[in-house]
Amino acid sequence: MNAILDKIDINSGYDIYKEIDEYETVIRNFFDKKIHPERFKSYRLIYGTYGVRHHEEGTHMQRIKIPGGFILSDQMKTIAELTRDYAASGHAHITTRQDIQLHYVALENIPALLRRLANVGITTREACGNSIRNITASYLSGINPNEIFDIVPYALYCTRYFLRHPLSSTLPRKFKISFSESDEDFAYAQMHDIGAIARIENGERGFKVYAGGGLGAVPMTANLLTEFINEADFFLLIESALRVFHKHGKAERENRNKARMKFFISRVGFEKFRELTFAELKLLKKTRNIGGDLKKYIEIFPLPAPTKNGRDDGLPNNKRISEPAIKEFIELRDNRYWDIFNEGLIEQRQKGYTALLIKPELGNLNPEELNILAEFSDNYGGGYALLTPAQNILIPWINNEFIYDAYNFLAERSFFKQVSGSTRDIVSCPGAFSCRLAVTHPYNLARDIGLNNEELGGLRIHISGCPNSCGQHHIGDIGLYGASIKSGGGIAPHYVVLLGGNIRIGKIGKVIGKIPARHAHNFIARTVELWNEEKNGNEQFHEFVDRLGFEPFRKILADYAVSNNTSDDLYKEPGFDENYKMEAESRGECAGSLLDLMAVNLFDSIRNIYEAQDDIKAGLINDAKRKCLESILLSSKMFVFLEGIEPETENDILSEFVNRIAAKNWLCNDWSNLKDIYYELKNSPGDKIDELFNYSKEFVYDCDKSFVRLQPNLKIQQCINN
C-alpha cells in the first residue's frame, strides 16, 4: 500500500517537514509572547489546530485531513498511536467531513504529532480556517454496482491541486467540495460550494456540477452549474468559480457572516454567476493544462482485489456450513453481535467480495479499536478503509470465503460492544464537549436517546450543539441543534427540532419547534413509534412528513413545552446533575478586527500576483501590470494600518510606507526606494512586465513572512535574517 502512497502523495513538491519546523517556531514565539495571539490563531488554524474549552489551558483540537475519506491501514495505526500519546480525550473522532479529530492535545506536542503524520503521507494543512476544507467523496466509490466510475482519485487529485493554492489560502471563509460516483449521491453534492457527480458523455469522463450550496445557520441547496464538463476542465472550472468569487465578492468579504459563495451567488443571481464563471474558464484554459498528473492518479484506481485475503488457517464458508456441528460456528450464529456484523455487510460490484460498514458510537474510536480495524483491514480487506459522512468506517475487499473468520476476528476482540447500541445510528458533532461555540452537549443527548430507545426505526438522526450544523442537522430525517431559553428566572437548555431533511434530493429539514433538552429523547421515541405505526410500505421519512404534515409532531413537542413542565430537570442537560450554564462564545475561531483587515489586503496581494502570472502567459500585459501594482499598494497599506493611518491615494500609501515602515527593519529587505521604483515601473513600457512582476512578487513575499512575526503589541518582530 505504500506504493500507492508514493504515487498519490498530495505533498509532492513541497517540503512538509520545513513547514512543520516553521510552525514550531511560531508556536515557540507564541509561548515567548513574541507574536500577537490573534495572528497566532490565524496561523495555527492553517494547520488544523483549533481552540477548545472545558479543559486545561493550552490544549487544542487537532484536525487531520483524510482526503476523500481514503485512509491506509498504516495511517490508521499511526493515528491510533497519536491518540494514545497525545489526545487527553482518549479517542479519535470521525467528522461529517471525513476528517479525524484528536481532542485536548497540548500545544507543545503539536509539531511532533504533525511530523509523525507526515511520515505516513498525511498533512493537516488547511484543515481549518478560511480555505478549501477536506474534499469529501462517496464512501462506496470503487465498489458500488451503480457507479459511473471511481471518483476517489479525482478527490485526491483535487486535494493536491488546491493544497497551498493562492486562491484557496486567501478565501474570506471556508469552501467545500464533494465527489459522488453515481446519482445516488452519497457525498451530498447539493450541500457543497461545488458538488460533482460522475458522468460519461461520448466515451469521455466528466462531471455534472452543482454550485452554491452550504449548511450553517442559513442553509442553501446548490444549483446545477452544468450537466457535463470533461474531467480536465472540471478542476479549472472550480478555480474559475474561486476567481469570480474573489473578483466580484467584495461585499461578502466585508461581512464575515455572509462571506460564503452561496451568499455571493444569492446576491448576483445564479445565471450571472454561471456567465462570469464560464467566461473566466475560457481565459484560464489559455494558460493551464490538466493532464499527466491527473492521469497518474486515475491509473491507480479502482484498486484491484488483494492478492492475499483472509487468514491462511481460515475455513471457507462452504466447509463451515456443511459442518454445522463445529462448536465455533454454532457460537458465532448464537452470538448476539452477529446481527450487527451481518447488517454492515455490503455486496461489492466485484464478484466474490464484500465490504463491511462499521458504526462506532458518535464516530469515536479509542487507540485499541483503531488498531483492531487497521489489522482487520490488513488481514481481511484491502489494506485501507473509507471514512463516511455519517461518521462510520467502510472496509472493502473482504473475500466471501472468509466472512465468518472476519467476524470472529472482531468478535473475539470484543469489538462489537462499542458499536452495538442504537446510538451508533446517530450523527453528532462533539458540541460543548470541546467546541467554544456550542450551546449544548449533543454527545449526552445522543447517549440519552440510545439508552431510552432500543431501535430508531431506521431514521437518520443528526444533532449539532449550535446552529452552525457541524452535525448536519438540516439533512437528517430528524435534526436537532442546541439552543437555550429564559424561563422562570433561569436558563433552560433546549433543542430546536427539524424534520424531513434529505439532501440527496435537495431537501432541507424544516424547523417545527423546540423541546427541553432533558425531554428530547421522548420526542424521538414517540416519533419513532408514530413512524412504525403509520408509514406506508417503502415510504421515506420525508414523504411520511409531507403526507402527515407537521401538526402531529408539534403536538408531541407541546406535551413537553416549558409551560407544561415545572420540574427542576427543565434546567438540566442530559448527563448533568447541576443546572445549565450558558457558556458559548459569541464568536468562534476566526476573529475579526484590524488583523482581519490586514489579512484581506495581504491575501488580495497574493491573489493578484498569482493571477498576473497567468495574464503574462496569456499576453494580457495591461491586466498583469495593473495587478502587480495593486499588490504593492495593498501590501504597503497593510503595514500602514498598524500606525493607525488609513491612506487612500496611491501617493499617500507609498509615502506613508516609506516614511513610517521601511526604516523599522520589520521586513527582511530594504524597501526605502519602494515609491520611486513603483512609479518607475508603472511608467515603463510593456516589455518591462517581467521586472515589475518579479519586484512585486518579492515585495509581497517579504510582507507575508513579516506578518507572521506580528507581536502582541502590534509591532513586527525584526527580521531574523538581519
Predicted features and spans:
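Inward-facing hydrophobic residues that define packing positions of alpha-helical scaffold repeats
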Residues: 609, 616, 621, 628-629, ...
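Peripheral terminal and linker regions in Fe-S/redox and tRNA-modifying enzymes
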Residues: 1-613, 618, 722
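Short, hydrophobic/amphipathic alpha-helical patches that form generic packing surfaces
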Residues: 243, 630-641
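Long, charged low-complexity segments
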Residues: 593, 599-606, 610-614, 636-722
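Short, solvent-exposed positions on alpha-helices
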Residues: 539, 622-626, 648
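Charged, well-structured alpha/beta interaction segments
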Residues: 620-624, 640-643
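Short, charged, amphipathic alpha-helical segments
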Residues: 622-629, 690-694
